[in-house]
């Protein structure tokens, strides 16, 4: 496999977020692009990172499918060293069992990290159906989650047709409520087809919300006592999706 990113911007934003959830990342490359799908160790959250072929300047893989597994901490360490405007190449070296990461900026640098051995079992993405979809300013939902973390350890979402989303944090003595409706600055679009209620871990939501740097818009999909779907799109070439199991408060 040899793929070339036009710059390091997306990698520097996305890799640390993914590394905060999983220790090993399995990247599956096909003619449709590169995809990472993984559950966190507690099996509470799933992360999906999709990169279309259009995200790359050059895109070459061996055969119909190529799978590589790396330590996300190793990848994060290297990505932190990259400059945003540097062109970046990922190249597999099967003889040395390494992933080479080439940075092409003012200085040409070549890093390498081990390819990990293990079962090449692809994690299936669950088939989920939602009737409630809300598009929010990503920095606004991050602010809501950050503020709520001072109140409680879970965040409650209530969807009310046709266009209201209530987000609430309740502690022993403190409480915070946010009501979002169509027409507000933080709301890009809101489509509530059915009433829904669910509660989710703030610790996980805080990790997800760091993706506000990836995209200006966060897409939420909700259903009663059902996994939360939180999606961020980078220039329509990459997608970062989080699926979070509900809490039974």
Curated annotation (Swiss-Prot):
Keyword terms, alphabetized: DNA replication, DNA-binding
CDD domains given in the database record: PCNA
Pfam families hit by this protein: PCNA_C (PF02747), PCNA_N (PF00705)
One of the GO BP terms on file: regulation of DNA replication
Entry GO MF terms: DNA binding; DNA polymerase processivity factor activity
UniProt xrefs under PANTHER family: PROLIFERATING CELL NUCLEAR ANTIGEN (PTHR11352:SF0)
Family statement drawn from the similarity comment of this UniProt entry: Belongs to the PCNA family.
HAMAP family xrefs: DNApol_clamp_arch (MF_00317)
Binding partners and assembly: Homotrimer. The subunits circularize to form a toroid; DNA passes through its center. Replication factor C (RFC) is required to load the toroid on the DNA.
Role noted for this protein: Sliding clamp subunit that acts as a moving platform for DNA processing. Responsible for tethering the catalytic subunit of DNA polymerase and other proteins to DNA during high-speed replication.
Protein name per its UniProtKB record: DNA polymerase sliding clamp
Native source species: Nanoarchaeum equitans (strain Kin4-M)
